[in-house]
């Protein structure tokens, strides 16, 4: 597909919807695969004799390659057909997932997590390039929200199915089945992928160099704010199952249900908030409404501290769900903001740079949490740090990001 008029976009709506469905499915699989190790952690830790500190390093190792490959991925998306870049990355991360079920040692497990991170690094630059080129401003909120909902539905399904599957067959079967099953997505993508969408350019214009993007105040605001939001999310994604089982003493089955509920709550909030922003913009509001969503959503997510501060398990889980709802409001808009600011010309590079910075939190959050839990023997200060980082991100979006409007390049 190539950029077309508004009326033509309407005629292409079924094809665009098919692409969006496949993108949502891909990101769901993406997040199942990156979060599956945390689901298996209580069982894997015992079988492979891994300490809490080692587990923190293991959980963060995915982000070493995922984060540092973002700049390369952004360049690849602008240089080559992102559809095939996406297909290659998807194959790599699915293979890494399946092979994880065969490992016998700590070192090989880290190597496969590094391969998983490298494969998954292409996803978001591809998403942003396609959405910036083929969705109007008042359509991007819901499109991004549905993709973000996939990041929550994936872990929800993975936590529920994975917990039940591992309780019956063990953790190795879970990884092998997941890796092989994921590959079923590839034939559908090859058939329906938007042809040459990733190399869309405005006629007569050149993509700005990275140094030009880095000169813009808005880029650094989105980098920092997204880092803070990701810290909160990766803290939950990597440590919530372990926390529920070891500190709150839930069974594996109960952990699976509660973890899934938290992810579903976030997905629902994301979808509703994205749809409401689109409706408001279609009715005449500016894209600044997305900035308010990110700021207030992340600010309200600080109630996560109450999860570990209260003794009653029911009250604790209610606070967890409330924090996830608030985070969902944040998650509905942060990528739509980037796509508006960058436009089709800079979407690949800006997204790659932003995702690089944001996902450094995936290196920091699991490892720092593991160190805090090892040092203190409980999770209170780990939750406190996550809450403080979320509040910082809220302030960055509210006061550090200016007007949300397309940057002028060239």
PLM feature spans:
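Conserved MFS/SLC helix-loop-helix module at the cytosolic interface between two early adjacent transmembrane helices
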Residues: 68-104
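Helix-loop-helix hairpin linking two adjacent transmembrane segments in secondary transporters
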Residues: 147-191
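Structural signature of the two symmetry-related core transmembrane helices
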Residues: 84-98, 288-305
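Residue-level signature of mid-helix packing/kink "hotspots" within the transmembrane helices
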Residues: 35, 63-71, 121, 155-156, ...
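Juxtamembrane intracellular "pre-TM" segments in multi-pass secondary transporters
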Residues: 5-12, 195-223, 247
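Extracytoplasmic gate region of multi-pass secondary transporters
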Residues: 37-38, 217-271, 331, 335
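Helix-breaking motifs and short loop linkers at transmembrane-helix boundaries and internal kinks
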Residues: 49, 81, 102-108, 119, ...
